[in-house]
Amino acid sequence: MAETSEPSCCPAGSAGYLAADYATAGAFASFGEGAAKVDCYVSGDAAARCAVILAPDVWGWNSGRTRALADAFAARGFFALVPKVLDVGGGLEGGTDGDGLPPGFDMAGRRADFMEWIKKHPHAGHLDAKIGSLLAGIAAEKVAGVGFCWGGYFVAHLAAAGGARVSSIASAHPSIQIAGVHGEDAAALCRAVACPSLLLPAGNDDKALYGEEGSLVAALKEGNAASAMRVFPDVTHGWTTRGDITDAAVARDTQIALDLMLDFTEKHSAG
């Protein structure tokens, strides 16, 4: 049965907007045509054995450190892509670089505006076509997903759609529960993920979903027993892409999370 409540994305106390000031190493590419077209930031060798799709948080494909994290995956030998998929209407009020939320958007104060906008980005009729274009256009033998916040929802659907070709997914401060906004059952979505999954929730992420006994953690383990989870209690939702790295805990845990995601992705794409 689909969830009847209307879940949000980022819990109270989450990291806010962070401008992207990183000197990128990559380029841009497009996959698909028409409504299914996906513009991407790409980094690394397109002929790599495994491509990693890094699905962004709600500030979209040029949010904070997202492209820097993609470059880190490219440096490890993956073909890394950050898709522009929160782009209905060019993003909310123009978004950030035409995608996602606009700079400085007040998530807490404008929740109704956020909810109205995010409902325009369902899987059925929008993300399914984008995922299809990515899977068809990427040459790599294997594909992995890495999601941040809302991106956790995207990579869960990527895994469900991609079958055995998708070797793993990982999600930092995940918001898979946003599935409920679109009338989906988030637990059922997680159970449909057959590949190993890694969840890295923050200290303020919903423990009923993402704690040691969390329902979505359990559902992902039902899908694949090799799935794993680690809570980061000292940081808040959004820390990897948007957290203040002048804070020692944020800097430390961003690096730890990146290393865990790199190692997990590498391990499960090797076979």
Locations of the language-model features?
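N-terminal cap/leader regions of alpha/beta-hydrolase-fold enzymes
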Residues: M1-G271
